[in-house]
């Protein structure tokens, strides 16, 4: 979808390590040939229902996102914990916190991936993009 300022790829209904990996690969890969790396932003919301694997899964996906070379923002306590040692990542506890940041720091001319579990409600951030 396209807002007045950015192009948005929204997948905020379901997220698991496999779907996150696929989304990041597509988004940052050669399939996205019209975008420059500096114009790509991944906004990743926590993945729900992972049990004891949750922390490790969020660490793995965050590292994959960082390695892809795109700007990374995260939402939710699991990604916030993973991002605490990553200076290049902006982490937010809630989608409301993300929206406040985006309103104060507008993005223009970006291609934005919004990917996370339903419980994070990342679609609400579209209003600030």
State the predicted function of each range.
Residues 1-129:
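ATP-dependent carboxylate-amine ligase
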């Amino acid at each position: 979808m396209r807002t007045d300022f950015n192009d948005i790829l929204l997948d905020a209904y379901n997220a698991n390590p496999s779907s996150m990996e696929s989304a990041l690969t597509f988004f940052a890969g050669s399939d996205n040939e019209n975008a420059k790396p500096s114009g790509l932003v991944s906004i990743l919301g926590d993945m729900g229902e992972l049990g004891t694997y949750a922390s490790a899964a969020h660490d793995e996906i965050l590292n994959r996102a960082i390695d892809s070379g795109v700007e990374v923002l995260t939402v939710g306590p699991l990604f916030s914990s993973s991002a605490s040692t990553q200076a290049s990542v902006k982490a937010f506890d809630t989608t409301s916190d993300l929206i406040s940041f985006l309103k104060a720091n507008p993005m223009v001319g970006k291609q934005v991936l919004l990917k996370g579990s339903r419980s994070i409600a990342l679609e609400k951030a579209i209003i600030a993009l």
